[in-house]
Amino acid sequence: MKALLPWGMMLTALPSLAGAVFGPGVCYDVGKGSYSADARVKDTPDTVLCWAASSSNLIQYWQDTYLKPHAQPNTPNGMNAKVYGEPQGTRYLNVYEQFLKSSTGDSGGFQADALNWWFKNAPMKELGGKEAYYSIFDAQPAAAEARSYLMEEPTLVQFREMLEKAFRFKGQAAGLYVWQINRKERPGTMPSKSRFHAITCWGYETNASGEPSALYLSDSDDRTFGVFMVHVDRREIHDPFSGMSYPSIVFYTDDDVDGYQPGEYEPNLHSACAVLTPESVAKPRSKPNATPAEAAQKNTLLPAGAKLGSDLLVGNGENSVLLHAEKLKLDATLRISGGSLASVDALSARQVQNDGKLYLHGGANAPGNVQNKGYLECVGADSITLQGCDNSGRLALRGNKAANVKGGDFRNSGTLLLCGKAGISFDKAALDSTSGTILLGQDANGCTPTELRFTDAEGRTLSVTSAPNAVGELHNVRITPTSIEGNGSNAVLRHVKISGNPKLVNVQLEP
C-alpha cells in the first residue's frame, strides 16, 4: 500500500486479491488524536470524538463522489488550512473541523447519529442542538443504519451481509463501532479513555466459504495515519467488567492469533452502520426552513410536514428552481415554473400528498413518492421521466422530446395523459401496475407523440403509433410483444394504429 498524503491512502494500491472488495479512490483518516492539545481537554491525552472523526471520513468520501458538481463556497469540504503537529505538518478535514466547532464538549457518540445530524439536521445531544450544514444539500435522508451486534451473537454470514450492503455502491464505506475488551490498543495509537471506539472500514476480504476473513481499517486515533489490515473471526470472548462470556465478531492482527497480548489491536464488533446510498446525491439549495411565503425564491426548502392550503407560485419561468419538500400535504394549487435546464429538477419532493393541483414546469424528472389524488402536471423542457408515483387522480406527463414511465413504485388507477413529441416509453412493470386509463396523443397544448413503446423484461418492444391529429386511449389493456389483452367490453383502443401484428384478445378497436 502506498500513502498518497499524510491524510489519505490510495486503496487501488492495495493488493488485488480474490474475494476482496475495496471502495475506489482515496480513503481518509483525520487523525483526531492530535486534538489532544485542545484547551477543552486538558487532563487527557485523548478526546472521545472518534465518532466525529470516523463520520468525517465517511462524509468526505461521499462528498468526493457526489458533491463536486454541486459544491458551494460554504460547503465544509476538503482539507483545512491549519497545520498541526503529531505527526508534524498534519492537516485535517474541514468536515471534522465543523464537528469540533459544534461539539459541546468531549463526549462520546455514534456515527449514525452524526451522519443524520449532518444530512438531516437530526438532533444530537453531543452537538448541543446546533444546526448542521445539511441545508446545502438536497439529499435523500442519509441511510445511516445503526445495528447493534453486541447482544445478537452474530454469525460471520450476518456480518458479511452488512459489509455487502456497505460496499454495494460507489462512494460508500462503513463506520464500525467496537467494544475494546481488555483495552486492546494498536501500537502508535492514542491511548483511549473509553472502551468504546469508532473506526472506519474501507474494504474487506472473504474466504472460500464466503465469510469475511479480513478488513481494511483506518483508526483516527492512529498517529501513523494509515490503512491497516485485521483478520476477522468469531470467538467466545470474556468481558472482565461484566463477568459475561459470549460469542462475538473479533478483529485481530497477525501477532495476536493465539491470544490476547497487551498492546495489540483486538476489539470486538459492537455495532455497524452502512451509510449514504447513492440516492443521497447532493444538489445545492439556499437556506433551510423557508416558510411557504418565502418559497417563491430560487432554490428553497419547505419545512418537513408542511401543509399548503393557499395557492403558491414558485419561480419566474426563467431561472432554474429547486423546491425541496418532505411529507408535504397539498390542498391548493402549487405552480413551480423553472427555466429550460432539463438537468435541474423542478421539484425534489418526497412523500407528497396532492389533493389539489400541482404544476411542475422545467424539470427533467417528475417527483418520486407522490400520492396524487388531484391534478399533477409535469412538463420537461427536454425529456421527462416519471417513477415512484401512486396516481388515482389525473396526471399529465409532457416531454418536449420524450416522456418515459418506469415501473417499480409506479401505480395508476386514475387517468394518465402522456405526451412526448419524440415518443413515449412505458416499461412492462409500469404497464402491469396500471388499471386505469392511459391517454396518449395531442391535448390542449398540441402535444402529439409519434409512438408509444412498451418494453418487457427481455427488452422486446411493441410500438403503438397514434394516427395523425388523433388521441389514443387505452382502457384496461395489457400489451406484450405478441398480444394485446383486454378486459372484455371495457378494453378499447381508439384512434390507434398498431404495428407488430400482435394477437388481439378481448380488445375492441374503434376508428
Regions found by a protein language model. Name each.
Residues 13-15:
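N-terminal signal peptide c-region/cleavage motif recognized by signal peptidases
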Residues 32-33, 183-191, 210, 227, ...:
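Intrinsic-disorder/low-complexity loop/linker signature
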Residues 160-162, 177-294:
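Active-site signature of cysteine proteases
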Residues 292-307, 313-328, 333-511:
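Extracellular beta-strand-rich, repetitive "passenger/adhesive" scaffolds
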Residues 18-127, 254-256, 260, 280-286:
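Active-site-adjacent structural segments surrounding the nucleophilic cysteine of cysteine proteases
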Residues 100-206, 212, 265-270, 284-286:
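Predominantly the structural core of cysteine protease catalytic domains
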Residues 1-6:
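Positively charged n-region of N-terminal signal peptides that target proteins for export
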